[in-house]
Amino acid sequence: MRKWIALACCLALIGMTIVACGGGGGKADRQTGQAGGSASPGGNTSGAANGQPDEPEEVTISIYYPLPDQTEARRLEDDKIRRFREKYPHVNIVKSDWHYSVEEIGLKMAANEAPTFFNTWATEAKFLVEKGWAADITELWNQYPYKDQINPILANQFIIDGRVYGIPQKGYTTSVVLNKKLLDDKGVPVPDYDWTWEDMLRTARAVAEPEKGIAGIAPMGKGNEAGWNWTNFLFEAGGDIQEVKDGKVTAVFNSEAGLKALELYHRLRWEANAIPQDWALNWGEAVGAFSQGRTAMVIAGAEGPLDQALNQGGMLPENVLTFPMPAYEKGGRHIGVLGGDWLVINPNATPAEQKAAFDYITFDYFTDDYLESLERDIQARQAEGKYFVPPQFNYFDSNSEYGRKVQAIFDKYDNVYKYDPESTRLLDGKPEAQYHTQDYYAVMTNVIQKVFSEKDVDLKKELDAAAALVQADYFDKIVLE
């Protein structure tokens, strides 16, 4: 899914100490600055003793590689591998198509089968660090000449207690992606970008045709993504997931704001009849329904639904609009969960492997080589009748010199999707909770499924029970230092 012009000087520092978090938090490793084993990844020092520079240690790293159906992304990654190997011939590359899974990461780490670096999300930072499954890359980060030009909002998600554990690729604020053609076909007005819950409800109800299998909106109803989708509305109503105070983490999502968000879901299902009849959809299924024209709206980071709608569903850019999340009421904030893609280095990797992984991850950052590769990719897509969908937020500041260079390339091609500036201006990202976010999502998914399946469900009772469960099973077990 993702070179730094000064990395050559990093090679002169290949003997540097690389910090990595060990299993169970790795406190000793953090104190000593060691990742276990030799602090000199090159090992043999005889070359230096003879006045000759050491040859870099030959290493093999397994990299996070796009899935088989992501043909354009694979083509871009293959080009990066070729260029990286030209500069770093001592690094062998193995492609891994394992993508991060909460259910699988523990098994992968225990069996030493996780790739040298892997993708993950903002919610996982605390979890991975506490489990000892993310290498402490602070020393590598501090040596990186462009660290101060990395988007701070994204970078800060993986900086914990002053230590760095992940590298951002791109980010998003959860949005609503809308099929304008479905609305036009039914004569339903397209709402303003500065819209509200009632505007969304009214639009979803008006465009839905249950008898034809067309929904007005498809809130996710299966997997942790169901709880994630709903949390956007919790935030918009002024609520939060947890409160951290006086050394304790307390569940607070069973608030008045939480009840309002649950009532909205109940209205979408039972009053408006605007959600899919087969509402138990995970991310892929909901986004797939959108790209196939079976729902007018879907809630997600915009890049994925846009890519599927344009490149698989055959939709035209003018018919696929990206909206901020609706405000609870007129004049309110359009808050969406802040998310994105981060890459984490495996703490089981050797120092030399961790260094090579860091070099690979950052290889194209802030470089003219990447700009050339990006333009070639856009041109190749254009020749195939495909579209390029930029991320909402990149690892760099869009207003920086480099950001302006990227935008100049985008402006040259009509097959690059253009986000509406007014919609982008209204985006208001809120980071996910610090602790046990995925567990909270899973519990809320059960509540949402009850709301969608039982018309007479006691919303307050279910919300209170969910908060009590999350508190007892997860938050009460947190020991804060």
Which residues does each predicted region cover?
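A structural signal for short loop-to-beta-strand junctions that line the ligand-binding cleft
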Residues: 107-108, 116, 144-182, 215, ...
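Glycine-centered hinge/linker elements that transmit conformational signals in sensory
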Residues: 204, 247-279, 321, 325
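Short, solvent-exposed loop/beta-turn-alpha elements that line the ligand-binding surface or hinge
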Residues: 54, 108, 135-150, 193, ...
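Hinge/lid segment of periplasmic solute-binding proteins
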Residues: 51, 122-175, 203, 229, ...
